[in-house]
Amino acid sequence: MGNDTIANLITSIRNADMVEKGTVRVTATNITKNIGRILLREGFIEDVREHQEGQKSFLISTSKYRRRKKRTYMTTSKRTSKPGLRIYSNYREIPKVLGGMGIVILSTSQGILTDREARQKKIGGEILCYVW
């Protein structure tokens, strides 16, 4: 039984936001790096960087908070496709999250993409998670 690094990343960020902890450290893999870059680009997190400790590589994510309120921009995230049950979609059937306010992160043949990028390129793939 392997580790689900995507669920670990999403759960760690969500738990850190609930206790108002600013940074999260998770194991770095190619998928978690790409998801971190997407969350940074879409404005859900403030910073993401890679940290090396000996042979192990970690991804350090910093949450982005609203000005006066201590709430984060990333209100909820949900892991959709799991190791035991993969969920695939073509580009026409990719769901919209909150009418386009959230994003769907997909694993496609051209890499990890958001729902908008996948629709634009007209490619489908495995639905990894929803973020809003």
Curated annotation (Swiss-Prot):
The record's Gene Ontology biological-process terms are: translation
Q: What is this protein called?
A: Small ribosomal subunit protein uS8c
Where is the protein found, in the record's own terms?
A: Plastid, Chloroplast
Which branch of life, at top level? Answer: Eukaryota
Which Gene3D superfamilies does this entry report, sorted A to Z? Answer: 3.30.1370.30, 3.30.1490.10
Instruction: Provide the family line.
Output: Belongs to the universal ribosomal protein uS8 family.
Q: Which organism is it from?
A: Pinus koraiensis
**The gene coding this protein:** rps8
Q: In UniProt terms, what function does this protein have?
A: One of the primary rRNA binding proteins, it binds directly to 16S rRNA central domain where it helps coordinate assembly of the platform of the 30S subunit.
Q: Which InterPro entries match?
A: Ribosomal_uS8, Ribosomal_uS8_CS, Ribosomal_uS8_sf
**How does this chain assemble?**
Part of the 30S ribosomal subunit.
Arranged from A to Z, the UniProt key words for this protein are: Chloroplast, Plastid, Ribonucleoprotein, Ribosomal protein, RNA-binding, rRNA-binding
Q: Would you tell me the Gene Ontology cellular component terms?
A: chloroplast; ribonucleoprotein complex; ribosome
Annotated Gene Ontology MF terms? Answer: rRNA binding; structural constituent of ribosome
